[in-house]
Amino acid sequence: MTVGVLALQGDFREHCAVLRRIGVEPIEVRLPRQLEQVERLIIPGGESTTIGRLLTIYQMLEPIRARAGRDLAIWGTCAGAILLASVVTDQKQGGQPTLSLMNLTIQRNAYGSQLDSFEAPITMPIIGEKPLQGVFIRAPRIISVGSGCEAVGWLEDGSVVAARQGRLLATTFHPELTDDDRVHRLFLEL
């Protein structure tokens, strides 16, 4: 199994470190030819507008869309989740390039600025009974989950923070910033 981590911007190094810790040597994906080598792709947190623009510049939007869910499982964390959503609210003026692969609506920076970042327990039965500690940094919020897409993770107040659609996974938090590797292991099973 080959796992790529989109390494254009954001916290790709942290995802790579978790993958190595669980015995997977990741490929840092910066070019379309590297994308062709992977069966799974993690789109990390960072700045969604910047990552979207870089995907456009490096001509990777269409190759990712063409393979998504078929021979390419994709997991987006935070900014990566924004890029996977079919509807994004609170975009910068003029919009932003997205992959628009998952039937969900997501709101950018829903919890406020960097100063409003927080940690909170997450219920995610798909990875086990024990709550997961979620790290939310300028995090988006999943507003709604549409047909074919299912909510798989929640905050205590019922807010959806993780969704799955076939071989596509979106988390609005950063599992790579904790010692808990259960979401990474889940992704390897998609």
From Swiss-Prot:
Matches recorded under CDD domains: GATase1_PB
Binding, L-glutamine: 46-48, 108, 137-138
Catalytic activity: aldehydo-D-ribose 5-phosphate + D-glyceraldehyde 3-phosphate + L-glutamine = pyridoxal 5'-phosphate + L-glutamate + phosphate + 3 H2O + H(+); L-glutamine + H2O = L-glutamate + NH4(+)
Active site: 78 (nucleophile), 174 (charge relay system), 176 (charge relay system)
An annotated GO BP: glutamine catabolic process
Pathways involved: Cofactor biosynthesis; pyridoxal 5'-phosphate biosynthesis
Annotated keywords: Glutamine amidotransferase, Hydrolase, Lyase, Pyridoxal phosphate
A GO molecular-function annotation: glutaminase activity
EC number, as in UniProt: 4.3.3.6, 3.5.1.2
A GO CC annotation given for this chain: cytosol
Assigned protein family: Belongs to the glutaminase PdxT/SNO family.
SUBUNIT field: In the presence of PdxS, forms a dodecamer of heterodimers. Only shows activity in the heterodimer.
Role, per record: Catalyzes the hydrolysis of glutamine to glutamate and ammonia as part of the biosynthesis of pyridoxal 5'-phosphate. The resulting ammonia molecule is channeled to the active site of PdxS.
PANTHER family: PYRIDOXAL 5'-PHOSPHATE SYNTHASE SUBUNIT SNO, PYRIDOXAL 5'-PHOSPHATE SYNTHASE SUBUNIT SNO1-RELATED
NCBIfam families from the UniProt entry: PLP_synth_Pdx2 (TIGR03800)
Protein name: Pyridoxal 5'-phosphate synthase subunit PdxT
